[in-house]
Amino acid sequence: MNIRPLHDRVIVKRKEVETKSAGGIVLTGSAAAKSTRGEIIAVGKGHILEKGTVQPLDVKVGDIVIFNDGYGVKSEKIDNEEVLIMSESDILAIVEA
């Protein structure tokens, strides 16, 4: 994918969510909510501080993250694939293996 986010923005590919309940029932509609986990596929250079220096981001390409899927998260289709563009501040946690 040929995309480079600016500043503190990251590109996230949403992870597929399980669409079956523990009992094997297929979930649909609002019960099959979108996942708030994804993989970082691109990162910007970092936060621009007051004196013009750049503070690198805490996340890196390949990290699995949990994010806030609300206001400020932009969904885009790039190369026929849906990705999310968000600020690093929209990321709540990094899932460690």
UniProtKB/Swiss-Prot annotation:
Pfam family, one: Cpn10
GO biological process, one term: chaperone cofactor-dependent protein refolding
Listed InterPro entries: Chaperonin_GroES, Chaperonin_GroES_sf, Chaprnonin_Cpn10_CS, GroES-like_sf
Protein's UniProt keywords contain Phosphoprotein: no
Record's keyword terms, sorted: Chaperone, Cytoplasm
NCBIfam families: PRK00364.1-1, PRK00364.1-2, PRK00364.2-2
Function statement: Together with the chaperonin GroEL, plays an essential role in assisting protein folding. The GroEL-GroES system forms a nano-cage that allows encapsulation of the non-native substrate proteins and provides a physical environment optimized to promote and accelerate protein folding. GroES binds to the apical surface of the GroEL ring, thereby capping the opening of the GroEL channel.
Subunit-structure text: Heptamer of 7 subunits arranged in a ring. Interacts with the chaperonin GroEL.
UniProt name for this protein: Co-chaperonin GroES
Species assigned in the record: Klebsiella aerogenes (Enterobacter aerogenes)
Gene behind the chain: groES
